[in-house]
């Protein structure tokens, strides 16, 4: 079977919402929503191998540490394991006073009773009721009409009131989800929710939660936002209701749908860390939170050690986080492209502490989430001088002059093309060392003696020449380097000279860079590093001289 030439024969677009006076497009998110993690319930039930109790507890502690204040821990009536986990959390004191446990139940009395029993002794708890309301579920799954579906919700809501009254020591919050809300007729979704509200009788001081799931994404995010705004306008007792979002990612727009839903008036967001969940996953709470953070809004969640959080999630879920996953993937703060690397390097050079973050290609400072800058720039065959320069500066304190950056990038490019692999900072430095610092033939500097005479410099150098010969060159000039050039037996023109310190204090070294031409040839660069700046400059000159002569010899051959 292949894709249809006319998909309209099999699929149809989801209808839009008639909301010409919608207001959400002109709004912005100005504060973090109430966060609820469903990792231990919705996320766990979607795993190939669900978490055992030990992993669940480890995950719970991570969520608490991050700052999630409402955590859906399990489906207590589904299994003894889930029931026992809730009991462990309560009896062993794993629920902080500022954190609320949430559990889920279907709309059957035996399951509801079991769910409330699992929460006995909890200081406070959210009990989450759901039943599907969309036309396809009514027709295909339940064979129920609208009244039948509404009756299921209302009868279960009454049972919530009954069983909660038997445990008055717990501060209860009731939550109702018209499952498949986004595929349900809005008038009917409102009708069912209004009926549940009537039973639970919330007040502004004691609110209930209405959770409005995009159980399966069926439309573009703007339609979901229209649904949320319409619902917020029309639901009864809006001031006594917390509107919650629960988006999945079937169309790849769960983040956008949630953000637009918050703009449309929602108060709360349910999801999972890094987007685990059924099928394509629940909305990713980490991305939502850090999207707020990068807009200057406190997300009320702490991902200062994002790699530590990822490690727990990967080990508990036994699923890897994609290397391109926003904010946390191994490659999301990495640039291979030469133009990107150059822009990032320049951005880092200009960025000052306390200023607004404006480094090109990096929407967040990796350091804010516990990332180092070491992986920001990596070098492969697509890389340019910016990335190479950045790595040498950051790892080895070597700042190549601009024209030398261009020359050395060609050397690196040739090596990456030859290897077909990425190069590390250490490999790049080794290549620099081999190409420039070990350029000792045909002339190797052995020693030098410098004297100042009447404001002029006199230099004598001992040089190891070809065939184990020892040469002595002498010259005078206005400075040490000019004196050395004057003493060379070859016509050399210095085009550019740069120097800087590597490190600080007594262990500091000097780096010198020379660009020269030999006998009117093309410019060539050399590098010298030494504790003594004069020695470093002499080494740089010999480096450039030898490289130029070797290139001329190779060209002649």
UniProtKB/Swiss-Prot annotation:
Mg(2+) binds at residues 42, 246, 248, 282. Pathway: Amino-acid biosynthesis; L-leucine biosynthesis; L-leucine from 3-methyl-2-oxobutanoate: step 1/4. It is an enzyme of class 2 (transferase). It catalyses: 3-methyl-2-oxobutanoate + acetyl-CoA + H2O = (2S)-2-isopropylmalate + CoA + H(+). GO terms for molecular function: 2-isopropylmalate synthase activity; acetyl-CoA C-acetyltransferase activity; magnesium ion binding. Residues 439-557 are annotated as: Regulatory domain. CDD domains: DRE_TIM_LeuA. SMART domains: LeuA_dimer. GO terms for biological process: L-leucine biosynthetic process. Its cofactor is Mg(2+). It is found in: Cytoplasm. Pfam families: HMGL-like (PF00682), IPMS_D2 (PF22615), LeuA_dimer (PF08502). Its EC number is 2.3.3.13. One of its GO terms (cellular component) is cytoplasm. Homodimer. Catalyzes the condensation of the acetyl group of acetyl-CoA with 3-methyl-2-oxobutanoate (2-ketoisovalerate) to form 3-carboxy-3-hydroxy-4-methylpentanoate (2-isopropylmalate). Belongs to the alpha-IPM synthase/homocitrate synthase family. LeuA type 2 subfamily. HAMAP family: LeuA_type2 (MF_00572). This is 2-isopropylmalate synthase. It comes from Pseudomonas putida (strain ATCC 700007 / DSM 6899 / JCM 31910 / BCRC 17059 / LMG 24140 / F1).
